[in-house]
Design a protein with these regions (language model features):
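Acidic, low-complexity Ser/Thr/Gly/Pro-rich repeat segments typical of extracellular/periplasmic
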Residues: 2-141
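Acidic helix-start/capping segments at beta-turn-to-alpha-helix junctions
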Residues: 49, 182-183
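The right-handed parallel beta-helix/beta-solenoid scaffold, focusing on the short coil/turn
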Residues: 145, 177, 188, 196-198, ...
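Feature marks extracellular polysaccharide-active and adherence modules
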Residues: 182, 193, 201-203
């Protein structure tokens, strides 16, 4: 595991370093001093802080995710592209349902995942436990039948799939449920099963965007 340190990471990460109420379904982001270049191989790992056990390994290039809630009788298995760079920011989408409520974690990034990058004015050589990108998730799941999703503001979930998982796991199939999406961009593949009365409404027609660059050679049909 990389041992380099980069000073105070607080303003540079999502969840921010030391955050105590992180979402289970949010993205990981790391903002560099300038635009990095993705390498040809490497991983991002999430570890449980209490015992250093690995809870997620996110690989460069294509990966497979299982959409749905933990223990569901049928999941949707999809290929997806979990790591990208936009401007100065490395953006990582962890796998579905790997984090738990009320747990503390830390993030590690292998050396070579990005190249030609500096972080807090230091050459980036990977990131491990000593860099202190730690966070603790929220204590408990939301309750009720009206759920709010926002990609950057206070809400019940960060992703639409997170809200759909909650509905599938906790509500009877004919129970009315409403998911409201605040304006933002939600780049995600989706799965909903055995629910007959779910309303998904965006804050506005023009600024609430749900999309993914899906195509037949990436995921044929609807997934397995």
């Amino acid at each position: 595991m990389p041992s380099a340190t980069y000073g105070d990471l607080f303003p540079l990460t999502t969840p921010f370093a030391g955050q105590q109420n992180a979402y289970l379904d949010g993205l990981l982001t790391l903002t560099f001093d300038d635009a990095p270049t993705l390498g040809t191989s490497g991983e991002v790992r999430i570890y449980k802080q209490s015992d250093d056990s690995i809870v997620d390994v996110i690989s460069m290039g294509g990966d497979i995710d299982a959409l749905g809630y933990h223990g569901q009788d049928k999941l949707r298995h999809v290929n997806y592209l979990p790591i990208k760079v936009e401007g100065n920011q490395l953006i990582v989408k962890p796998h579905n349902n790997v984090l738990e409520y009320g747990e503390s974690y830390y993030v590690a990034i292998s050396d070579g995942l990005v190249t030609d990058a500096s972080l807090n004015s230091q050459l980036f050589n990977g990131l491990g436990k000593t860099a202190n990108w730690t966070f603790t998730t929220r204590e408990a799941a939301p309750t009720g039948t009206h759920l709010l999703v926002d990609d950057d503001g206070e809400a019940d979930f960060r992703s639409l799939q997170g809200a759909l998982n909650y509905v599938m796991e906790n509500l009877p199939k004919d129970q009315p449920a409403t998911i409201t999406l605040r304006d933002g961009e939600y780049e995600e593949l989706l799965f909903l099963r055995n629910q007959n009365n779910v309303t998904i409404q965006g804050e506005s027609r023009d600024n609430t965007l749900v999309y993914y660059a899906n195509y037949d050679s990436l995921n044929s049909g609807s997934g397995d």
